[in-house]
Amino acid sequence: MNDSSKPLTQRRHLLTVGAAVAAALAGAGAAYWQSKQEQAETPRMPITGDLDELWQMQFDKPDGGKLAMQSLKGKPLLINFWATWCPPCVEELPLLERFYNQNKAKSMQIVGLAADKPEAVRTFLKKLPLTFPIGITDLSGIALSKSWGNLAGGLPFSVMLAADGHVMQRKMGKLSEDDLNIWQNAV
């Protein structure tokens, strides 16, 4: 290598390193932005679905019969939309089960609305039995959740109703124990 090619080689090396650093910074910035977006609670927006209609709804129960939403009216109610094919939904169900068992005597209610096929829900509940009420909505549950503020139509999606039926909280994404405690204290 002659002396005249050394500066060119050094310049290429510096450009390569500079490009790598810029790419790393851009990637880190994008990852940070995405993590903040995922942590953000569902934006507040008016609910287009008529909550009065909610109390008239009935859903098939996994073991047969109907889950009448009217039977849950008048107490704080957490409605959780989930599906057996949704990993975050499945991960949060044991937390919801624990929370339900700790709080059912305190008039706190939970209902799970499975946006799934009835047979898939029945099979799933044999492996992970739940004691809080479950209704099966098929895929129409996703449209229902959208009318209550689930802009993306993603699962899991949870809505917390006060005893008088007004919406207190909403979240698209997996609930945490902190979420549940905050929501419970708000009612």
Predicted regions and their residues:
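Aromatic-flanked redox-active Cys/Sec active sites in thiol-based oxidoreductases
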Residues: 80-86, 115
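Structural microenvironment flanking redox-active thiols in thiol-disulfide oxidoreductases
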Residues: 91-129, 139-145
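N-terminal targeting signals for export/organelle localization
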Residues: 1-56
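A short beta-strand-turn-helix
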Residues: 56-77
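Active-site acidic short loop of glycosyltransferases
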Residues: 72-75, 105, 131, 153
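Conserved hydrophobic/aromatic "anchor" residues
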Residues: 57, 81-82, 124, 132
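C-type cytochrome heme c attachment motif
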Residues: 84-91, 157
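Thiol/disulfide oxidoreductase modules built on the thioredoxin-like
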Residues: 127-130, 138-185
